[in-house]
Swiss-Prot record:
Monomer. May form homodimer (via Ig-like V-type domain). Interacts (via Ig-like V-type domain) with CADM1 (via Ig-like V-type domain); the interaction competes with CRTAM homodimerization and CADM1 homodimerization. Interacts (via PDZ-binding motif) with SCRIB (via PDZ domain 3); the interaction promotes CRTAM and SCRIB polarization in a subset of CD4+ T-cells. Its main location: membrane. One of its GO terms (cellular component) is plasma membrane. Pfam families: C2-set_2, V-set. This is Cytotoxic and regulatory T-cell molecule. Glycans are attached at N21, N87, N178. Residues 309-393 are cytoplasmic. Changing Y101A: Reduced binding to CADM1. Severely impairs interaction with CADM1. CDD domains: IgV_1_Necl_like. Mediates heterophilic cell-cell adhesion which regulates the activation, differentiation and tissue retention of various T-cell subsets. Interaction with CADM1 promotes natural killer (NK) cell cytotoxicity and IFNG/interferon-gamma secretion by CD8+ T-cells in vitro as well as NK cell-mediated rejection of tumors expressing CADM1 in vivo. Regulates CD8+ T-cell proliferation in response to T-cell receptor (TCR) activation. Appears to be dispensable for CD8+ T-cell-mediated cytotoxicity. It comes from Homo sapiens (Human).
């Protein structure tokens, strides 16, 4: 029993002296300075180390481990290591770790969340007119490059706040997004107003507001109608009046209206309709058209490259055949010339040898004939010489 009590008494101070394993969350806006603090109660024979979310060492005690000057040492002592990261970006998000080395190794994790506040909203209005004479106003409120996605609502006549059809489009990195909210107004009064309100965590309770007054839209429509009427009277050619505020003629039937699914809110001055598919459908069509065009161009380019490669291969085969034929012809010509020279030399050698033999035989025959004549003449002279003395006697 006493042994257990003593063990517990020795264990509690060690736990208080060491760095507790826990996770802390820090939220910071993009462009601000991030401060990371690591504090322990131990003061002797201990070391502190900060690690990036990717696992690289930032500082080991007061010694920097990275050449990146983005991380700066704020304070170092035996029981504290604090660093700063100025001008924070979305790439600095993640879980940073502080390691405390003493008799054992303990870890403190700091989860850093970087917020990107939305830009000032842009509000656009357009009038759509159908063949049956009905018309409605489409309001689009958009903001760009925010993280996380903002919340967009519509304030009708300073009394009622509703939500429209919201579309979020994330950028290629998957972090920031562009948000658009669409609201369709079927009926409105001249003094009616609509405000686009944007809320976001990075705004810290503040709101971004883009107001719209329908009296400006009515004034623009009346001005455009008067100008068109004057032009029609002067040219004696009646025309239908159009609005300069993005007026669109819609030739579709009421079946399209049945396919639209919105939230409907009625007011004494306003009847609203939220269309979450209006902007998405148009962008989807344009995206499909662009993708089809790019695919067709890539296919044409692929065919051209294949034809060029085939032409190069054909030319290479023809050149190779011609080269082989020329080499074969040259070798045959060389072998033929060598054979002719060899045969001519053999013929010359064979014809000269009999001639030499004939000349030698002729020479021997002539010499033998000459000697024979000389012997005959000599024998005749001897016979004459012998016969003369006998006659004298």
């Amino acid at each position: 029993m006493w042994w257990r009590v003593l063990s517990l008494l020795a264990w509690f101070p060690l736990q208080e002296a060491s760095l507790t394993n826990h996770t802390e969350t820090i939220t910071v806006e993009e462009g601000q300075t991030l401060t990371l603090k690591c504090v322990t109660s131990l003061r002797k024979n201990s070391s502190l180390q900060w690690l990036t979310p990717s696992g690289f060492t930032i500082f080991l005690n007061e010694y920097p481990a990275l050449k990146n000057s983005k991380y700066q040492l704020l304070h170092h002592s035996a029981n504290q290591l604090s660093i700063t990261v100025p001008n924070v970006t979305l790439q600095d998000e993640g879980v940073y770790k502080c390691l405390h080395y003493s008799d054992s190794v303990s870890t403190k994790e700091v989860k850093v969340i970087v917020l990107a506040t939305p830009f000032k909203p842009i509000l656009e209005a357009s009038v759509i007119r159908k063949q049956n004479g009905e018309e409605h106003v489409v309001l689009m409120c958009s903001t760009m490059r925010s993280k996380p996605p903002p919340q967009i609502t519509w304030l009708l006549g300073n009394s009622m706040e509703v939500s429209g059809g919201t579309l979020h489009e994330f950028e290629t990195d998957g972090k920031k997004c562009n948000t658009t909210s669409t609201l369709i107004i079927h009926t409105y009064g001249k003094n009616s107003t609509v405000d686009c309100i944007i809320r976001h965590r990075g705004l810290q309770g503040r709101k971004l507001v883009a107001p719209f007054r329908f009296e400006d839209l009515v004034t623009d429509e009346e001005t455009a109608s008067d100008a068109l009427e004057r032009n029609s009277l002067s040219s004696q050619d009646p025309q239908q009046p159009t609005s300069t505020v993005s007026v669109t003629e819609d030739s579709s039937t009421s079946e399209i209206d049945k396919e639209e699914k919105e939230q409907t809110t009625q007011d004494p001055d306003l009847t609203t309709e939220a269309n979450p598919q209006y902007l998405g459908l148009a962008r989807k069509k344009s995206g499909i058209l662009l993708l089809t065009l790019v695919s067709f161009l890539i296919f044409i380019l692929f065919i051209i490259v294949q034809l060029f490669i085939m032409k190069l291969r054909k030319a290479h085969v023809i050149w190779k055949k011609e080269n082989e034929v020329s080499e074969h012809t040259l070798e045959s010509y060389r072998s033929r010339s060598n054979n002719e020279e060899t045969s001519s030399e053999e013929k010359n050698g064979q014809s000269s040898h009999p001639m030499r033999c004939m000349n030698y035989i002729t020479k021997l025959y002539s010499e033998a004939k000459t000697k024979r004549k000389e012997n005959v003449q000599h024998s005749k002279l001897e016979e004459k010489h012998i016969q003369v003395p006998e006659s004298i006697v």
